[in-house]
Design a protein with these regions (language model features):
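Active-site metal-binding motif and surrounding structural segment of the metallo-beta-lactamase
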Residues: 44, 49-87, 162-166
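Glycine/Thr-rich phosphate-binding loops of Rossmann-like dinucleotide-binding domains
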Residues: 23, 54, 74-75, 95, ...
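Active-site metal-binding loops of divalent metal-dependent hydrolases
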Residues: 16-20, 48-51, 69, 90, ...
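Short amphipathic alpha-helical segments
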Residues: 57-59, 76-79, 97-99, 158-160, ...
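Conserved beta-strand hairpin/beta-sheet module of binuclear metal-dependent hydrolase folds
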Residues: 3-57, 131-148, 165
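Cap/insert and terminal regions of metallo-dependent hydrolase folds
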Residues: 153-235
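A short helix->loop->beta-strand "cap" motif at the edges of active sites that frequently abuts
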Residues: 42, 81-84, 200-206
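Metallo-beta-lactamase
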Residues: 2-10, 87-141, 227-233
Length: 235
């Protein structure tokens, strides 16, 4: 799909994978969740799970950006990468054994331009052992927020401000996958909880990725109704 008002230089989004960390594969959800963002003559791959080990090189990304260190998001880099890899300090700490040589740090709430595309990391609640971030991604007149794993966004209003698309967590549609470990929460917010965030912050389109199974029209019928100002897409 393409974004932006400039038809001569649009931002292109390619969903390379939409599957979560589960054994079940379907035709639509075959590879671990990953998004390729292309702008001008460069492409940045967001996340590179174990499914992509030995395969992602054929995509020739100019850079890779990681949301967190879980196997389905980062273990495709176990043997290294032929391009720069950007991640938070907490993620690099968990990936100490990965053979990535060209490592770069992304600081939370500090916009960073990578291959002409601006990435701003926002802390999200998801895991204690592998702390995660979501990314506000912008280039030209296009802006999206990508967060395949989360319970909630710590600074949601700033993260979603003027975003055209919210790409969120499809691990569960309506049942909560949130658990408590000590004083911390871990797990996944249901899609049912994420849609009101988009409505409140005025995001016109929500795309759900990181699916646990094939999403049917019957399942989506049980979700809160999208308003006239918001469109829901199940990937």
């Amino acid at each position: 799909m393409t974004l932006g008002d400039d038809s001569s230089c649009p931002v292109k989004l390619i969903f390379l994978g939409t599957r979560g960390e589960i054994a079940t594969r379907t035709r639509r959800h075959r590879m671990h969740s990953s998004l390729l963002v292309s702008y001008r003559d460069a492409s940045v791959m967001i996340d590179c799970g174990l499914d992509w080990l030995g395969k992602f090189e054929r995509l020739h990304p100019n850079a890779i950006v990681l949301t967190h260190a879980h196997p389905d998001h980062a273990w495709g880099l176990k043997n290294g990468a032929p391009c720069p890899v950007h991640a938070s300090q907490k993620t690099w700490r968990e990936l100490e054994g990965c053979e990535v040589e060209d490592r770069h740090l992304i600081k939370e709430r500090v916009p960073k331009k990578i291959c002409g595309i601006t990435f701003e990391a926002f802390a999200v609640e998801h895991s204690i052992l592998a702390p995660a971030v979501g990314y506000r991604v912008s280039a030209g007149h296009a802006c999206i927020f990508y967060v395949p794993d989360l319970i909630f966004i710590h600074d949601r209003a700033a993260a979603l401000k003027d975003a055209q698309i919210y790409i969120g967590d499809g691990a569960t549609l309506s049942r909560s996958f949130v658990r408590k470990r000590g004083k911390r929460l871990i797990g996944h917010a249901p899609v049912r909880a994420q849609l009101p965030w988009c409505r409140k912050e005025g995001v016109p389109q929500a795309i759900i990725t990181h699916a646990v199974r094939k999403l049917s029209p019957q399942m989506s019928a049980n979700l809160p109704q999208s308003s006239a100002r918001m469109e829901l897409i199940l990937r």
